[in-house]
């Protein structure tokens, strides 16, 4: 019974719960439908508002576009109006110009007619004057006793003298102004180069004399029946002169490298004491290797000292060979290094490529390394070597033209020539023997005295200056300038000399009278 009541209670409770849940569900559905209706109304209201806003925006844009179009049309209309005004103005100007041209054509026609009339009058007057000139020439010939050609020649000669006088005066003025400016600039550049460079030595002689410990060593050098000296001369290609000079042997040969090999070999033989043909050949081979190594090292050191690179090995070898060459007792390799430094410094002072100038200066005498084996001047040979070993065209031309064998195509040719002259002209840099010195002075004086109007000529300052005395009644002041230039050009073309020579022409007039 209790169980039955419990089950009935459970059923009643479940039914109540079911009824309650169904009522709640119905209420939720009603509320959801109400919210959906509210959202739909709000969405419709937003759509209507958005449509109104879009419509208003489109109206605003249409109004703005209409205003912009109207503004553009107004500006275009104004441009067209202004353009039309300009066209009207130009049309009126063209009309006025056409009228002016028409008037000028009429005036030209009138002037042409007047010119034709005046031309006829001029021709008539010219014929009249020609007749007068012929009559005057006849009368002048009768009065002066000169023919027309003779008078013309005399007048032409006077005009030529007058023109030469005027040209000489102007040339002197131009030269004075140019020389003053050039001298000032050249002094600045050269002084800067001299101040910035300091050479280590002045003169370096290539030794060709070997000192002996005793005179008895001469006999050992000669050997039995001269076998040793003949073997040494054959191996080195040089002549050995053994005379009365005490404790010395002179090595003679045109090739400086062979001379150096012979000197080293002979010194080693003398120091070792073993002198026979087999030993001589061995020592000469060893000396040749040592000299070759010394040549290469000297060339590399010169290139390093100058501060350049990418030099062909054969060029470096030839540079080293210059260590054993001298020019007026000046070592050619040291001279080349000095010229390279001078050229580089002057190039930098002038705003040029200093490295390229140093390369030109270092190679300018490279032809002296081979000129005893090949014909031609050292400048030409040097240019051919630079061309052969693919040096820059500017360097090749500078080497080729530094003595003006050809025309320089850049400023580096004259620059190399100036550096070469600067190195050679330093006091003590070069020396020459007495015979050559006297011959050069006599040649200078001979060249000067060959010119017309020269009375005397004196070479002074060791041949660095040539003073020329001229006759005052045969050479005037302007002619003195031309004479100095002509003498200098003649000296340049006929003589070879280190440095430069100054030519000074002196014209002096003395007047005297005796008071009684």
Swiss-Prot record:
> Region annotation Disordered: residue ranges?
98-121
Keyword set for this entry? Cell membrane, Endonuclease, Hydrolase, Membrane, Nuclease, RNA-binding, Transmembrane, Transmembrane helix
Which cysteines in this chain are paired by disulphide bridges? none
Which superkingdom?
A: Bacteria
Q: Which residues form the HD domain?
A: 332-425
- Principal localisation: membrane
E.C. numbers: 3.1.-.-
Where does this one sit in the cell?
Cell membrane
Boundaries of every KH domain copy: 206-269
* Gene Ontology cellular-component annotations: plasma membrane
SMART domains from the UniProt entry = HDc, KH
**Membrane topology reported for the UniProt record:** Single-pass membrane protein
Q: Where are its TM segments located?
A: 1-21
The entry assigns this protein to a family as follows:
Belongs to the RNase Y family.
Protein function: Endoribonuclease that initiates mRNA decay.
Q: Which named protein is this? A: Ribonuclease Y
* Organism, scientific name: Magnetococcus marinus (strain ATCC BAA-1437 / JCM 17883 / MC-1)
Lineage of producing organism: Bacteria, Pseudomonadati, Pseudomonadota, Alphaproteobacteria, Magnetococcales
GN (gene name): rny
